[in-house]
Design a protein with these regions (language model features):
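Secreted/periplasmic proteins that engage bacterial cell-wall peptidoglycan
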Residues: 2-135, 144-151
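Short, cationic low-complexity segments
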Residues: 97, 167-171
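C-terminal partner/receptor-binding element of secreted or periplasmic proteins
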Residues: 142-166
């Protein structure tokens, strides 16, 4: 959202995290969501599924659930940042209808918190707000030039749910 726009508070929703466990088969809604990000914002997927622990933790990564994707814009560093900023602002504005559970802005691109450090910031649905990351509490890749997005299980499992959500947004 632009700097002159107040953050519209939505309803906080439960955060799934990795509670659905390793899911080694593709979730078609996640793939369709990525296709929309590629089409709308010129993103490229850096990966969805990876059965591995989170960075700096023994806990399972949400990538193992087939509900998380890392996205990067194409082109120059500026083009990448501009595309990610537009995408993050869009995802945040439509977070409820799209079932967005978490957004990691490793380098702060698109995050509405001013004066972030190199650790960036993140959005989570259960607090329905952004949080500035610190050297002690961050997502493990400070300054990363990509964006991590997690969607809800019902969206990840359904192409129809994803398509209906985007149809409602662009109605």
């Amino acid at each position: 959202m632009g700097s002159k726009t107040r953050e519209k508070k939505m309803t906080s929703r439960p955060y799934t995290g990795n509670t659905d466990g390793n899911h080694p088969t593709e979730r078609p809604g996640t793939k369709r969501f990525v296709e929309f990000m590629e089409y709308l914002f010129g993103m490229k997927s850096l990966g969805i599924y990876a059965n591995r622990p989170m960075r700096g933790s023994a806990s399972l990564s949400v990538h193992a659930t087939w509900r998380a994707v890392d996205l990067k814009g194409k082109g120059t560093a500026k083009q990448n940042a501009d595309a990610r900023k537009a995408m993050v602002e869009f995802l945040f504005a439509h977070r409820d209808i799209l079932g967005i559970e978490e957004i990691h802005a490793y380098d702060g691109v698109g995050c509405p918190i001013p004066n972030l450090t190199k650790f960036g910031g993140g959005y989570r649905c259960d607090r329905d707000s952004w949080k500035a990351w610190t050297p002690q509490k961050n997502a493990g890749t400070p300054g990363g030039d990509w964006t991590h997005v997690e969607i809800a299980p019902n969206m990840a499992d359904s192409v129809t749910a994803i398509e209906k959500a985007f149809a409602k947004i662009f109605g």
